[in-house]
């Protein structure tokens, strides 16, 4: 129903329409291929090749043997999504094995891909895989995809299907035998001065549990950003049962025959709109405040070595300028998702249409959006998440001592931004910065979260993971080495393995 981003408008102001089907439209947008008949044998061969790769690339193979207590982990990773899995393998490649990844979900349900992610395809091109393979080609997504579905299929796609990516992550964890402990919800993290480690207070299958670790990596992506952003006008005027957020568990078949309003213009708003129509919604109206849907994705511009590797080294004023510019520009859906939605007959996009008033009456939602009045059966908030570490209960006993940008940086007049000012001020390895020296233990916590997205330059997504994780892992292994330097030197002096 829509031309590319430079589309014309119809006779009604700010309603985008299309008279042609874009070349980006795909009738098989939702299709998932069937594995090859011999996929099992092909995958077995890939795993054999991978095992050979790991043996060849194992130098230096010696692991850390200086744990002060076997009851204390060297590293606890909170979250077993793609970031947590890759962090664990990267630590292993650096000889740090006393690690556990904790995840509150059951096995194969970790991360967002089978939870609230509803995009048919990933938003990044297929070759951007977050560096999960750590330089080992046979661990790369493309090798797994070709083994299971064929080289022709791999060559034919531009973006990986979301559910295939989820399958790959399952295989990644299984073939590497990653130390994932599922059904474990880390609820509080505190510092124990006597033991010089973090205490992770948790529930494991409903029972209380306590774990200890020298270092903690918070690898919970979007879920470690502060929670859902639901506009106050919706919260205050609609009953909870009448609306959802895109991060909710939504029963899409229940929307069959319904008229639905989607608020927000980012990727998740469009993803959910497509699923609503696929489930049989009569119509989906998507409304945004901006006069024009953003059509510029500077993330694509940033995908080069200089930016990814060195942005975090920039002076604070430069990082602030980049971040402020990106926030003002706004988020946009991927082109393939945008065109797929705009070519659906039941979909309409309304720009320049902020919610002015809204109410619920006799099973319907009546709202004024810009200068239009609508009534719908349901409403979905595609309004993103709040970036606020104070709203993250797992961090409640740490955040009072974590420095924010407002504590260490003053922007020029006219460049103030309250949300950015509240972001945690992270070090160059994504570690928290303590407000005072007495809380220096906070630098042993690493924040691999969407809450680090703007000012650190690392968005905790596939475009950034392979550049963020080496910084974290190097910093951890460096501290482990220096903290154990006396033991290590004693071992060095005691070494007595004669060559002849």
Indicate where each model-derived feature is located.
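Core mature regions of organelle-targeted
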Residues: 108-119
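Flavin (primarily FAD) cofactor-binding/catalytic cores of flavoenzymes
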Residues: 3-105, 110, 154-267, 271-279, ...
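Flavin (FAD/FMN) cofactor-binding and adjacent substrate-gating region
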Residues: 118-151, 301-314
């Amino acid at each position: 129903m829509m031309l590319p981003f430079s589309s014309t408008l119809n006779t009604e102001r700010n309603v985008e329409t299309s008279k042609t089907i874009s070349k980006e439209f795909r009738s098989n947008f939702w299709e998932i291929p069937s594995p090859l008949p011999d996929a099992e044998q092909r995958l077995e061969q890939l795993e054999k090749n991978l095992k050979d790769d790991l043996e060849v690339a194992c130098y230096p193979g010696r692991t850390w043997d200086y744990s002060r207590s076997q009851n204390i982990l060297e590293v606890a990773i909170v979250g077993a999504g793609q970031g947590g899995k890759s962090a664990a393998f990267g630590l292993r490649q650096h000889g740090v094995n006393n690690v556990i990844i904790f995840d509150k979900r059951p096995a194969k349900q970790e991360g967002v891909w089978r939870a609230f992610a509803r995009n048919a395809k990933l938003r990044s091109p297929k070759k951007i895989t977050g560096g999960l393979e750590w330089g080992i080609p046979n661990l790369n997504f493309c090798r797994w995809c070709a083994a299971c579905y064929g080289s022709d299929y791999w060559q034919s796609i531009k973006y990986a299907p979301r559910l295939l990516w989820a399958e790959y992550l399952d295989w990644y964890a299984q073939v590497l035998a990653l130390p994932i402990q599922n059904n474990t919800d880390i609820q509080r993290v505190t510092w124990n001065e006597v033991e010089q480690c973090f205490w992770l207070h948790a529930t494991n299958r409903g029972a209380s549990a306590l774990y200890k670790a020298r270092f903690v990596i918070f690898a919970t992506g979007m879920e470690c950003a502060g929670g859902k952003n639901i506009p106050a006008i919706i919260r205050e005027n609609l009953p909870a049962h009448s609306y959802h957020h895109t991060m909710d568990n939504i029963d899409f078949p229940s929307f069959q025959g319904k008229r639905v309003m989607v608020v927000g213009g980012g990727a998740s708003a469009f993803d959910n709109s497509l699923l609503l129509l696929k489930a049989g919604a009569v119509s989906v109206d998507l409304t945004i405040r901006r006069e024009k849907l953003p059509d510029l994705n500077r993330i694509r511009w940033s995908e080069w070595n200089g930016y990814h590797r060195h942005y975090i080294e920039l002076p604070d004023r430069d990082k602030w300028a980049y971040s402020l510019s990106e926030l003002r520009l706004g988020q946009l859906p991927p082109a393939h998702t945008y065109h797929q939605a705009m070519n659906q007959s039941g979909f309409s996009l309304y720009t320049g249409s902020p919610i002015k008033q809204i109410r619920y009456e006799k099973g319907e939602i009546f709202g004024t959006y810009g200068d239009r009045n609508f009534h719908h059966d349901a409403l979905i908030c595609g309004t993103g998440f709040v970036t606020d570490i104070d709203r993250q209960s797992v961090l409640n006993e740490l955040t009072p001592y974590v420095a924010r940008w407002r504590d260490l940086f003053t922007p020029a007049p006219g460049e103030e931004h309250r949300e950015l000012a509240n972001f945690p001020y992270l070090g160059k390895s994504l570690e928290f910065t303590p407000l005072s020296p007495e809380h220096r233990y906070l630098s042993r916590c690493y924040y691999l979260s969407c809450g680090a997205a703007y000012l650190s330059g690392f968005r905790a997504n596939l475009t950034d993971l392979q550049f963020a994780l080496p910084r974290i892992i190097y910093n951890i292994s460096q501290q482990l080495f220096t903290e154990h330097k006396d033991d290590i030197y004693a071992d060095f002096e005691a070494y007595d393995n004669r060559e002849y």
